[in-house]
């Protein structure tokens, strides 16, 4: 699969082909198809990083540097998305329904700090211990952090 040059419009196909390693929620697929982000190869590389190294760290198959070193080499920042109190003020933006439960997209992987969606990427996700998969709820744009 990695030999194909994936475009943002291919995200549904990519998600289906990789569903055994990572889950891309329908709203993340829809937002990606509408996106103007200019580095699709980076987005797919980040999804691979979450499906591979991040999941290996979470399942104890790799130490955290396996993920951190690759994220650093791609110029990515990784961390918590927003405080739960902020997320609560934003309605359902920071939450997805997963296996009948409301789940907080508590992590994000990001590149760039400009608000311009052509140059800035955010992948909001949570890790599901039961399935041992990353669940991506929104990408590749910023989610708002206040109601202003």
Question: Which role fits each region the language model picked out?
Answer:
Residues 1-121, 128-148:
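Basic, Lys/Arg-enriched alpha-helical interface segments
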């Amino acid at each position: 699969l990695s030999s194909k040059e994936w475009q943002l419009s291919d995200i549904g196909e990519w998600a289906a082909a990789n569903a055994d390693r990572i889950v891309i929620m329908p709203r993340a697929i829809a937002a990606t198809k509408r996106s103007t982000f200019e580095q699709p190869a980076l987005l797919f590389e980040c999804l691979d990083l979450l499906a591979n190294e991040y999941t290996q760290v979470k399942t104890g198959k790799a130490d955290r540097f396996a993920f951190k070193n690759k994220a650093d080499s791609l110029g990515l920042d990784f961390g918590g998305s927003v405080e739960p109190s902020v997320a609560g003020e934003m309605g359902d933006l920071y939450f997805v329904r997963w296996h009948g439960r409301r789940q907080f997209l508590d992590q994000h992987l990001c590149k760039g700090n400009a608000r311009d969606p052509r140059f800035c990427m955010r992948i909001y996700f949570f890790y599901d211990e039961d399935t041992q998969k990353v669940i991506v709820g929104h990408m590749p744009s910023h989610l708002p952090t206040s109601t202003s």
